Amino acid sequence: MKIKALSKLKPEEGIWMTEVDKPVLGHNDLLIKIKKTAICGTDVHIYNWDEWSQKTIPVPMVVGHEYVGEVVGIGQEVRGFEIGDRVSGEGHITCGHCRNCRGGRTHLCRNTIGVGVNRTGCFSEYLVIPAFNAFKIPANISDDLASIFDPFGNAVHTALSFDLVGEDVLITGAGPIGIMAAAVAKHVGARHVVITDVNEYRLDLARKMGVTRAVNVAEQKLDDVMAELGMTEGFDVGLEMSGNPSAFNSMLKTMNHGGRIALLGIPPSDMGIDWNQVIFKGLVIKGIYGREMFETWYKMASLIQSGLDLTPIITHHFKVDDFQQGFDIMRSGMSGKVILDWE
């Protein structure tokens, strides 16, 4: 049986609608009928066919890794799922036999394979993944929100790396993940949550999500904002979401002594760092990749159920046949999360 899918068919800019074989269910797998998918920044990199994509992505391949769907097939070894369960899923497929996997630190697996990056993705009518990777969505969480659990998980993993209660938090980079991290920080009790960017559309979106201040660093100095807020000692926690060297270095300058930084944004490999700031301030820097399995997922569901409102971050919906419009708006930078409807 042939099904509809969005694939990287050629080693050049673009993503194409195509037909592929329906995936085959393995003994330990679930077959998921896709309801909605969201376009990730990673998918935009793959669309643009940048240096990272050229080194990483096999062609041809179905892409995508942010989704919600319904279980329609269950492998014979699988327990704990039923036909009709609504699920999203962890996009990092881990080996199960390295030291970190066996020690319960699966997010640190050294043999991680990415759905829609190293193997067939979710931008199709059906997806097969290991049942271990599926996460049941509580009934009171919408399909829209469930479809963005993967990037929301990046935000939650980054934000909850350190205690935020009563702390002043600086977030550099107001992409969807940065904005969601800001909303999480505010929800769990941070005092001042300041987010920086140069994209006014995204900063406005951050304001709608309740940040203390959204700062356009092309027009305003961070030092002035700190003074206006009555901050005398610098930020306690930094969440770096941009991969931008000047953003990271301004974060280092404005951190308090003993401050803690979580890095999710991917900087150029030759980024210069003022290490004196790190050493003499006694800063702690932690790299973040993916989500903790599955602690982050439980936290995500609980945060939404306890009143965290992420709905403003979802700005556009398109039918899957209009996927090109979705990619165009994502590439313009004038969007939050963009959802493609497969039903």
From Swiss-Prot:
Location(s) in or outside the cell: Cytoplasm
Database matches in PANTHER family: L-THREONINE 3-DEHYDROGENASE (PTHR43401:SF2)
Record-listed NAD(+) binding positions: I177, D197, R202, L264, G265, I266, I288, Y289
Name of the protein in question: L-threonine 3-dehydrogenase
Location (main, coarse): cytoplasm
Reactions mediated catalytically: L-threonine + NAD(+) = (2S)-2-amino-3-oxobutanoate + NADH + H(+)
Pathway membership, UniProt: Amino-acid degradation; L-threonine degradation via oxydo-reductase pathway; glycine from L-threonine: step 1/2
Example GO molecular function: zinc ion binding
Cofactor(s) in the UniProt record: Zn(2+)
InterPro entries reported in the protein's UniProt record: ADH-like_C (IPR013149), ADH-like_N (IPR013154), ADH_Zn_CS (IPR002328), GroES-like_sf (IPR011032), L-Threonine_3-DHase (IPR004627), NAD(P)-bd_dom_sf (IPR036291), PKS_ER (IPR020843), Zn_alcohol_dh (IPR050129)
Gene Ontology process terms (BP): L-threonine catabolic process to glycine
Source species: Vibrio vulnificus (strain CMCP6)
Gene: tdh
Cofactor binding mode and count: Binds 2 Zn(2+) ions per subunit.
A GO CC annotation given for this chain: cytoplasm
NCBIfam families in the cross-refs: PRK05396.1, tdh
Active-site residues, Swiss-Prot/TrEMBL: T42 (charge relay system), H45 (charge relay system)
Subunit structure: Homotetramer.
Keyword Lyase carried by entry: no
